[in-house]
């Protein structure tokens, strides 16, 4: 029986276009000035040092690191340091009202229903935990962070690695067979299933014929029969 649901964000709870057409361009435009203006702040300095370690360039200047970050953004690399810095920039955008976090209309009613049924809800995204909390804290529907029991990012491991899901199961404190992962990417679901989890793939756009996972078009179609399996 499912006791906890872990959901992805991009393409699952939220339109991928919000991430790619709103969040990413905002970060790209504002990241250099943010880093230069805040490089002495502990969180920013820590992320920059983490980036130096990641690229094995301990003497890299701030401008050199900014150039590295632009390269990472061009590659869509899942860098923990990049995600942390993007999250800090996005915080400014949410706070100044430049945007709110997109939610598909089926998401909030389903989350509330599952919580009322006693299911614990979690988030696992390649975006930093801070960025996840911002999206749900400043969502189109207001602050819904109270629905979630916890958040996970790439500190748990990459989303296509089996060990990431083992680490998350350990953090949650439930056996894998009681966990359900929701994502739009079948390679992520493959890793979760290999770790013993239940899986459901959200198909918000074109069908994924290469997938071997149960597919639904929205959260409403994740039915009670599945949750009781």
Curated annotation (Swiss-Prot):
Entry's EC annotation: 3.1.3.77
Subunit structure: Monomer.
GO biological process: L-methionine salvage from methylthioadenosine
Signal peptide as annotated in the record: none
Role description: Bifunctional enzyme that catalyzes the enolization of 2,3-diketo-5-methylthiopentyl-1-phosphate (DK-MTP-1-P) into the intermediate 2-hydroxy-3-keto-5-methylthiopentenyl-1-phosphate (HK-MTPenyl-1-P), which is then dephosphorylated to form the acireductone 1,2-dihydroxy-3-keto-5-methylthiopentene (DHK-MTPene).
Membrane-spanning segments: none
First-tier enzyme category under EC: hydrolase
Cofactor note: Binds 1 Mg(2+) ion per subunit.
InterPro entries: Enolase-ppase_E1, HAD-like_sf, HAD-SF_hydro_IA, HAD_sf
Keyword set, alphabetical order: Amino-acid biosynthesis, Hydrolase, Magnesium, Metal-binding, Methionine biosynthesis
Native organism: Erwinia tasmaniensis (strain DSM 17950 / CFBP 7177 / CIP 109463 / NCPPB 4357 / Et1/99)
GO MF, any single term: acireductone synthase activity
Pathway: Amino-acid biosynthesis; L-methionine biosynthesis via salvage pathway; L-methionine from S-methyl-5-thio-alpha-D-ribose 1-phosphate: step 3/6; Amino-acid biosynthesis; L-methionine biosynthesis via salvage pathway; L-methionine from S-methyl-5-thio-alpha-D-ribose 1-phosphate: step 4/6
Short name of any one Pfam family annotated for the protein: Hydrolase
Family classification: Belongs to the HAD-like hydrolase superfamily. MasA/MtnC family.
Catalytic activity field: 5-methylsulfanyl-2,3-dioxopentyl phosphate + H2O = 1,2-dihydroxy-5-(methylsulfanyl)pent-1-en-3-one + phosphate
Domain of life per record: Bacteria
Cofactors named for this entry: Mg(2+)
Protein name: Enolase-phosphatase E1
């Amino acid at each position: 029986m499912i006791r906890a649901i872990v959901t992805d964000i991009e393409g699952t709870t939220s339109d991928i276009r919000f991430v790619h057409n709103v969040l990413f361009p905002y970060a790209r435009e504002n990241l250099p000035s943010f880093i230069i203006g805040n490089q002495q702040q502990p969180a920013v300095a820590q992320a920059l040092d983490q980036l130096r370690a990641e690229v094995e360039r301990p003497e890299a200047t701030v401008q050199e690191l900014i150039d590295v970050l632009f390269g990472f953004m061009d590659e869509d690399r899942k860098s923990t340091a990049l995600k942390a810095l993007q999250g800090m920039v996005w915080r400014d955008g949410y706070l100044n009202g430049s945007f709110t976090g997109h939610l598909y209309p089926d998401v909030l009613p389903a989350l509330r229903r599952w919580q009322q049924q006693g299911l614990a809800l979690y988030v696992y995204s390649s975006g930093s935990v801070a960025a996840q909390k911002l999206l749900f804290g400043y969502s189109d529907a207001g602050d819904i962070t109270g629905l979630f029991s916890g958040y996970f990012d790439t500190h748990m491991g990459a989303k296509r690695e089996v060990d990431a899901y083992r680490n998350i199961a350990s953090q949650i404190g439930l056996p894998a067979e009681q966990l359900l992962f929701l994502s739009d990417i079948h390679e992520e679901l493959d890793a979760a299933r290999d770790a013993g989890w239940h899986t459901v793939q959200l198909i918000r756009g074109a069908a994924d014929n290469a997938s071997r996972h149960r597919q639904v078009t929205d959260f409403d179609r994740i039915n009670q029969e599945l949750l009781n399996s």
